[in-house]
Amino acid sequence: MDVDVFNGWGRPRFEDESLMPPGFRFHPTDEELITYYLLKKVLDSNFSCAAISQVDLNKSEPWELPEKAKMGEKEWYFFTLRDRKYPTGLRTNRATEAGYWKATGKDREIKSSKTKSLLGMKKTLVFYKGRAPKGEKSCWVMHEYRLDGKFSYHYISSSAKDEWVLCKVCLKSGVVSRETNLISSSSSSAVTGEFSSAGSAIAPIINTFATEHVSCFSNNSAAHTDASFHTFLPAPPPSLPPRQPRHVGDGVAFGQFLDLGSSGQIDFDAAAAAFFPNLPSLPPTVLPPPPSFAMYGGGSPAVSVWPFTL
């Protein structure tokens, strides 16, 4: 690798510029495009480099340019000759078969970072499909670089041709076409409507689920066998009446329930009814049958008084 010194500017130059080193990326600044590349092309029309192709932009559509570029993923660089509309005029022909390039905004000055002197100008153009003035704006953007100021052609050489320009073409990111917007809006509306209808259908189910229940004591439980799942909510627990405090000996003598003469057993049913008068009784189907066991060595079944099993 040697160093090519040109007009006070030094840059490394590979002996075989067609073979780029691994990881090489071509991202020059505006000043570098003017001083390292366009100026050399203007002085020597045979000048070429590994990163910039030479094309006729009037015979190429913007979507064809990435394939004609030597390198680049989002930006592509080209040398091209200006096509004058008239031999003696200054207006440039920027039309292709499918459309035309239209300038937008003001030209931007490119100055030296060291001396602040003017080196060139940058023009921004947008590609329109169709013919003016009814062309359809596209996402393709081109920045056209030309020499100016201290690098003006009459300062360089009388034999230099000012038709050479350097162009950077890119596809503007984040731009969505009209068709894509329509599809996206219709899709989002359909999805929103679907969720809205689903939500309205689920709402009564949730309301029913929250309000309906079947009592465990209902005689119509068989009628709800095929009902939806929300009918199987458990009923709230029954509220027990407040118990009245009683003391042994207050109006009821516990001994009166002893019947030792006949069977030698205690009448627990009568005792429970006397001591717990407000205790609710439940149907026998609610509680499992009480276990049987012998009391005092006898064979009689145990007496069950809810909630006690003896």
Curated annotation (Swiss-Prot):
Changing residue 307 to L: In cuc1-6; cup-shaped cotyledon and abnormal SAM. It holds the Pfam family NAM. InterPro entries: NAC-dom (IPR003441), NAC_dom_sf (IPR036093). Its main location: nucleus. GO terms for cellular component: nucleus. Expressed in inflorescence stems, rosette leaves, aerial parts of seedlings, flowers, floral buds and roots. One of its GO terms (molecular function) is DNA-binding transcription factor activity. Induction: By BRM, at the chromatin level, and conferring a very specific spatial expression pattern. Directly induced by ESR2 in response to cytokinins. Precise spatial regulation by post-transcriptional repression directed by the microRNA miR164. Keywords: Developmental protein, DNA-binding, Nucleus, Transcription, Transcription regulation. Residues 179-210, 306-310 are annotated as: Involved in transactivation activity. Residues 20-172 form the NAC domain. GO terms for biological process: flower development; formation of plant organ boundary; lateral root development; meristem initiation; negative regulation of cell division; primary shoot apical meristem specification; secondary shoot formation. It is found in: Nucleus. Overexpressing transgenic plants exhibit adventitious shoot apical meristems. The NAC domain includes a DNA-binding domain and a dimerization domain, and confers the specificity of the transactivated target genes. PANTHER family: PROTEIN CUP-SHAPED COTYLEDON 1, PROTEIN CUP-SHAPED COTYLEDON 2-RELATED. This is Protein CUP-SHAPED COTYLEDON 1. The gene is NAC054.
